[in-house]
A protein has these predicted regions:
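N-terminal amphipathic/basic leader segments beginning at the initiator methionine
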Residues: 1-24
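Divalent-metal (Mg2+/Mn2+/Ca2+)-assisted nucleotide/phosphate chemistry catalytic cores
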Residues: 125-212, 221
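C-terminal non-catalytic interaction/assembly regions of soluble proteins
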Residues: 269-424
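Short glycine-rich or small-residue beta-strand-to-loop segments that form or flank ligand, phosphate
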Residues: 42-51, 74-81
Length: 424
């Protein structure tokens, strides 16, 4: 076992304060064409299942601003098959983020029922959306803009995907992922988004960008006429703020946790460089020989989608898996490869030893090993001696403490995570 030091990545960030978040969310609503909806009309506000910083505050502000403007907003879960593909499950997902009728001051209408609003123009795919949203006088979706974990394109994870996949509920999500195997997601999302924009009174979306520390960097109102072009520009900004591992070639990486509240892929493929989605290519970097993942976040509620990216997992993670929840999610997305169960180990010591012994001929002095809390919290990392030495030569890295032996108790790693375990 190599000794491990602590390094930090030097990121310059300027997150919004709580007051600024509320002000930016209200201003974002003001940038939407509300006049397209008759005064007193209903506006369906789509909210997803991702763990987004300040989500409850942003949603509450959007709802309050619409109400003060003379409209009757209601919230609907726009999260595809998440929450076990049930209305009750999706309502519970929102509640875990503090989004309840009492807290938001408006109704939450949750249903898995959909209605067809059109067909694809180049591929004859049915375009379906949430029934309640389709019956509203206007639709507005709220989502974070970020690189997707399974494909690259002009728009990836954001407003367009929420309209197509999230608002499509399980049926729409299943159709989208099925057709994506032969018709790439990068082409399908814009095409189906245009069908939805033509069929419904979508007044736009509230786009959120987060910085490398997982904090709110910007909130922007995007009108429907600019939805695809503006989202593409915002995606460029999101790429620049995407946290990454600071080395391109690594022997072993330990992640203390994975989960759906961290990334749709459990472990963000933009960080791991691993992508097992049929028809899509993996990122060019980093190259990681072995990945060990220790536990599943409580916020995942057993959904271990993406566990197949790891080479070794702790038995605690395996025992925390809800197989049915995981299977529903991955059958809907079509990415069954991500449900493959890695080697399981009863102790951290056994798991780390398995990774080291299968990563090539290495010594404690030469092995390139990192330990991170998860793929979203990458500011502070444990690093082996070889990587600590490399960090001293770089202006973007700082060595916080020199390597010391890893501490185990009965085989369990007792050194705390680089940053606090747990997620919103």
């Amino acid at each position: 076992m190599p000794p491990m030091g602590v390094i930090e990545q030097a990121w310059e960030t300027d997150p919004l304060s709580d007051e600024a978040v509320a002000a930016a969310a209200a201003a974002a609503v003001g940038g939407l064409p509300l006049e397209e909806v008759p005064t007193g009309g209903s506006i369906a506000v789509g909210v997803g299942s991702r763990g987004i910083a300040n989500l409850a505050r942003i949603v509450a502000t959007v709802v309050a601003t619409l109400q003060s403007s003379g409209y009757e907003p209601f919230i609907f879960p726009a999260m595809g098959s998440h929450g076990g593909a049930t209305a009750e499950g999706q309502t519970a997902v929102l509640a875990r983020y503090g989004i309840t009728e009492a807290a938001m001051g408006c109704p939450i209408i949750a249903s898995m029922e959909t209605t067809e609003v059109g067909r694809g123009r180049t591929h004859d795919v049915p375009v379906v959306v949430d029934e309640a949203a389709a019956s509203a006088d206007g639709v507005c979706v709220i989502n974070r803009i970020k690189p997707h974990t399974s494909f690259t394109g002009d728009v990836e994870s954001g407003l367009a995907k929420m309209l197509v996949v999230g608002m499509g509920k399980q049926r729409g999500a299943k159709l989208a992922h099925q057709y994506a195997h032969d018709w790439s997601f990068s082409e399908m999302l814009p095409a189906i988004t245009e069908v939805i924009l033509d069929a419904l009174c979508v007044i736009g979306g509230i786009a959120i960008i987060e910085d490398q520390h997982d904090m709110t960097a910007a909130i922007v109102g995007v009108p429907p006429s600019e939805l695809l072009t503006a989202e593409a520009e915002l995606l460029t900004e999101a790429y620049a703020l995407l946290p990454k591992l600071p080395f391109e070639s690594l022997d072993v990486v330990i992640f203390d946790q994975m989960g759906k509240d961290i990334s749709g892929a459990g472990l963000d493929t933009n960080v791991t460089g691993r992508n097992y989605v049929m028809g899509e290519t993996a990122r060019a970097e980093p190259t990681i020989r072995r990945i060990y993942t220790r536990q599943l976040t409580t916020g995942s509620h057993g959904n271990a989608a993406g566990v197949g990216q790891a080479d070794v997992i702790h038995a605690d993670l395996y025992r925390a898996m809800d197989i049915e929840e995981t299977v529903v999610n991955l059958l809907t997305s079509g990415t069954v490869e991500n449900a493959r169960i890695p080697i399981t180990a009863e102790t951290d010591r056994a798991a780390i030893a398995a990774c080291i012994s299968t990563a090539g001929v290495r010594t404690p002095e030469t092995i390139r090993m990192l330990r991170a809390t998860d793929t979203m919290q990458l500011h502070r990392l444990y690093a082996s001696p070889a990587l600590c030495a490399a960090a001293t030569e770089r202006a973007d890295l700082r060595v916080v403490s020199e390597p010391t032996p890893m501490r185990f108790d009965g085989g369990r790693l007792v050194d705390p995570a680089p940053t606090a375990v747990g997620h919103r």
